[in-house]
């Protein structure tokens, strides 16, 4: 696949890194020569210095042959115009635009971004995607990772198995016997930084992060089996009042009437601005790394501290300070995968990685076949995938035990007409079923083959 990416910042670089690693033909455009130099030095991509919405610059990037244009600069208007140019002058099949300003995304104005008005096929808002991930973590405090598929009917959750975890050293087949009525399936394990698909003979070890698939209404019960029955937070401190912090605070005010929210923002003008946009939250002007500010926010009595500034180090350190001062749980926004790798070891209860979240959103549209959802694990080592089974799919009409699935794949659930089914060897997938599965990176091409439209269909 030929892909042109406009914007070589954190988001654009992350997308380019992932797509290039999968042997796609990637060109990346940015006005900064330094960013292009970094991208071409570190990645197998073609770099072009220039304005991402200029036709001549896009032409130099090879837009005429592109299958997809991904515009993720920091400027919404540049992204919009780039998509318009890609459509009108170069007939690019798929256009993806990053939109940051919330006014464009309001329901009354969003139709402007539809194909009928502005030729944007996919709108991504990393700030909203990250904000929603934070909100999901708050609703499931026992999980270190979570995503929902099947129109919200299915949840995938990662859970840390500590020394007190009741199911450590128990074979997965025995778990099924112990809890026969629990419709949850463990599909993957992260062990010492390496992710693997599970088999029935596997045992969970202390320190593992187990990923399970369960109906949304059974996630709490499943977490309790792993020894996690934490109560969702009510007293919440948010460090950082940027777009993500403001979105999380606003949504908490709407969704959680019992929540008591404090927002700490270091910029005085920004603090005043977000205070005007919030109704029940208390906004404090100050540094979230300052002990006196955290004390003023009531950190000793808080349930959760969330650090959402643009600086990974500030987020990690402010969370650790908050925990030392009495916060029950801490959640940090971490952009650099290197920091994310040791976050749990430092005592960070959970973290969100904006780059990984955005890449997952883009991959949903890069993957071939009827792929409805993608959630990347461990910086691309594996993926949770939701796909629609077609009449011509090799999965349809045969018991799962007769399907030649690779060792790096594991089916976690089948959704039929809104009903979530736990898969067994006797399960027969039907056309239009939604299948939720895990696949290692090397086996994703096989997943695409299973869910692609066969030429025989036509």
Curated annotation (Swiss-Prot):
Residues 144-228, 372-453 form the RCK C-terminal domain. NAD(+) 2 binds at residues 235-266. Pfam families: TrkA_C, TrkA_N. Keywords: Cell inner membrane, Cell membrane, Ion transport, Membrane, NAD, Potassium, Potassium transport, Repeat, Transport. One of its GO terms (molecular function) is potassium ion transmembrane transporter activity. It is found in: Cell inner membrane. NAD(+) 1 binds at residues 7-11, 30, 73-74, 98. Residues 1-124, 233-352 form the RCK N-terminal domain. It is a peripheral membrane protein. GO terms for cellular component: plasma membrane. The RCK N-terminal domain binds NAD and possibly other effectors. This is expected to cause a conformation change that regulates potassium transport. Part of a potassium transport system. This is Trk system potassium uptake protein TrkA. It comes from Azorhizobium caulinodans (strain ATCC 43989 / DSM 5975 / JCM 20966 / LMG 6465 / NBRC 14845 / NCIMB 13405 / ORS 571).
């Amino acid at each position: 696949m030929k892909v042109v990416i406009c914007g070589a910042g954190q988001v654009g670089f992350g997308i380019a890194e992932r797509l290039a690693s999968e042997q796609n033909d990637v060109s990346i455009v940015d006005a900064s020569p330094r960013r292009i130099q970094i991208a071409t030095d570190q990645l197998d991509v073609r770099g072009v210095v220039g304005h991402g919405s200029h036709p001549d610059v896009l032409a130099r990037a090879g837009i005429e042959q592109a299958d997809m244009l991904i515009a993720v600069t920091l400027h919404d208007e540049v992204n919009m115009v780039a998509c318009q140019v890609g459509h009108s002058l170069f007939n690019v099949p798929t256009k993806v635009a990053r939109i940051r300003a919330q006014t464009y995304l309001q329901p009354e104005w969003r139709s402007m971004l539809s194909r009928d008005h502005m030729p944007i096929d996919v709108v991504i808002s990393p700030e909203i995607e990250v904000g929603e991930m934070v909100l999901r973590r708050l609703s499931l405090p026992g999980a270190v990772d979570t995503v929902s598929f099947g129109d919200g009917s299915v949840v995938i959750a990662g859970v840390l198995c500590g020394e007190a975890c009741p199911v450590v050293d128990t074979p997965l087949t025995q778990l099924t016997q112990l809890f026969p009525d629990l419709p949850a399936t463990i599909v993957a394990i992260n062990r010492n930084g390496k992710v693997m698909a599970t088999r029935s003979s596997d045992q969970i070890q202390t320190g593992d992060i187990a990923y399970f698939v369960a109906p949304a209404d059974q996630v709490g019960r499943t977490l309790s089996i792993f020894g996690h029955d934490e109560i969702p937070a009510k007293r919440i401190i948010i460090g950082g009042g940027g777009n993500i912090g403001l979105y999380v605070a606003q949504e908490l005010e709407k969704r959680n009437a019992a929540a008591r929210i404090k927002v700490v923002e270091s910029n005085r003008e920004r603090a005043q601005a977000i205070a005007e946009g919030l109704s029940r939250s208390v906004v404090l002007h100050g540094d979230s790394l300052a002990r006196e500010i955290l004390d003023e926010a009531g950190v000793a009595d808080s349930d959760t501290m969330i650090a959402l500034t643009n600086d990974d180090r500030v987020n990690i350190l402010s969370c650790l300070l908050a925990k030392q001062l009495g916060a029950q749980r801490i959640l940090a926004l971490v952009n650099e995968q290197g920091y994310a790798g040791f976050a749990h070891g430092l005592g960070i209860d959970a973290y969100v990685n904006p780059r990984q979240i955005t890449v997952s959103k883009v991959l949903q549209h890069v993957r071939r076949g009827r792929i409805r959802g993608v959630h990347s694990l461990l910086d691309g080592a594996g993926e949770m995938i939701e796909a629609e089974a077609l009449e011509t799919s090799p999965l349809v009409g045969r018991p799962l035990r007769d399907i030649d699935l690779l060792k790096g794949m594991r089916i976690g659930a089948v959704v039929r007409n809104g009903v979530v089914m736990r898969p067994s060897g006797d399960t027969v997938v039907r056309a239009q079923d939604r299948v939720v599965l895990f696949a290692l990176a090397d086996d994703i091409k096989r997943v695409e083959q299973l869910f692609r439209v066969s030429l025989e269909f036509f």
